[in-house]
C-alpha cells in the first residue's frame, strides 16, 4: 500500500513539475505577444501598408517599402536557396555516400549554427565590396546562405522516410533513377519538404544582422536590385533606436506585423507536417 501511494505521489509530483516547466516556457511567450499587441495594434491602419515612412517631425506614414523589400529579399533568397537545398538533399539521400556526403552534412550543420551576423560579413566580403555598394542582391545572398542548410537537412530527412518499396517498384518498371527520384520519391515527400521550406522562410523573415552588412536599408522605394533596399527587420531596428515617438509607434506596429507573419508561417509548417504524418 505504501509503495502504491509513493508511486502515485511521485507521478503527481512529476506531472506538476512538467506543468511548471511548460508554464515557464509559455508565460514569457504570451507576455511578449501581449505586449507587442498592446504597443503596436493602435498604429496598424491602412496607411501603414501603403505609405513609406515620413520625414522626422511629420506624423503618420507606414512601412510599405519595408514590406515590399522583405518580400523581394525572401523571393530572391528562395530562388537560390530552395533549389540548392532540395537538390543537395536529393544527392545526399539518393546518390551520396561515404566521407564526401558526411562532409556536406557536417558543413550544413555548422552553417546552420553560425551566427547570422557572420553570414552577413561573408556576404559583405563576397558581394558588397566587389560591387562597391550595398544591394538587394547581397542581402538575398546572405539570407540564402541561412536558408540552404535548413532546407537541405529537412528535405533529406523527409526523403529518407519514403518507403524503399516505392523506389523499387518504379525502377522495376524501367523508370530511370533520376525520374524515379523526381516523380516518385520527391513527390511522396512533398508535404514534408514544404514544411522545411516554410520554416526556412520564417527564419530568414526576421533576420536583421546579415542585412545590416548587405542590404543596409532604404527610407524610400527601391527600384534596382543593385541598390540598398528596405526590409521590415531593418526598419524596426532603425525606428526602435530613434528618439522619435512616431517612429517608436511604427516600430511596434512593424514588430506586430512581422510576428504575425512568422506565426502564420509556423502554423502553415505545422499543417504540412501534420499532413505528412497522416499520410504515413
Predicted stretch roles:
Residues 13-14, 156-160, 195-198, 238-280:
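C-terminal transmembrane helix and the adjacent membrane-cytosol boundary/short C-terminal tail
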Amino acid at each position: 500500500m505504501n509503495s502504491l501511494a509513493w508511486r502515485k505521489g511521485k507521478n503527481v509530483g512529476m506531472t506538476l513539475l512538467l506543468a511548471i516547466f511548460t508554464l515557464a516556457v509559455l508565460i514569457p511567450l504570451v507576455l511578449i505577444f501581449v505586449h507587442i499587441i498592446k504597443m503596436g495594434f493602435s498604429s496598424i491602419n491602412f496607411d501603414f501598408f501603403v505609405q513609406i515612412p515620413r520625414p522626422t517631425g511629420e506624423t503618420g506614414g507606414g512601412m510599405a517599402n519595408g514590406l515590399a523589400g522583405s518580400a523581394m529579399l525572401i523571393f530572391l533568397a528562395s530562388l537560390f536557396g530552395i533549389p540548392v537545398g532540395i537538390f543537395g538533399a536529393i544527392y545526399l539521400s539518393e546518390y551520396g555516400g561515404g566521407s564526401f556526403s558526411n562532409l556536406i552534412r557536417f558543413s550544413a550543420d555548422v552553417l546552420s549554427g553560425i551566427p547570422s551576423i557572420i553570414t552577413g560579413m561573408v556576404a559583405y566580403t563576397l558581394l558588397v565590396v566587389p560591387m562597391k555598394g550595398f544591394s538587394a542582391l547581397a542581402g538575398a545572398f546572405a539570407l540564402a546562405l541561412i536558408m540552404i542548410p535548413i532546407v537541405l537537412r529537412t528535405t533529406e530527412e523527409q526523403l529518407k522516410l519514403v518507403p524503399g518499396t516505392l523506389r523499387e517498384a518504379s525502377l522495376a518498371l524501367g523508370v530511370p533513377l533520376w525520374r524515379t527520384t523526381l516523380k516518385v520519391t520527391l513527390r511522396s515527400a512533398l508535404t514534408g519538404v514544404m514544411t522545411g521550406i516554410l520554416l526556412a522562410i520564417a527564419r530568414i523573415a526576421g533576420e536583421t544582422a546579415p542585412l545590416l552588412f548587405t542590404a543596409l536599408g532604404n527610407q524610400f522605394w527601391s527600384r534596382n536590385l543593385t541598390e540598398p533596399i528596405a526590409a521590415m527587420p531593418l526598419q524596426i531596428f532603425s525606428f526602435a533606436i530613434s528618439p522619435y515617438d512616431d517612429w517608436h509607434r511604427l516600430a511596434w506596429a512593424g514588430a506586430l506585423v512581422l510576428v504575425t507573419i512568422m506565426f502564420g508561417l509556423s502554423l502553415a509548417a505545422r499543417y504540412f507536417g501534420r499532413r505528412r504524418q497522416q499520410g504515413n
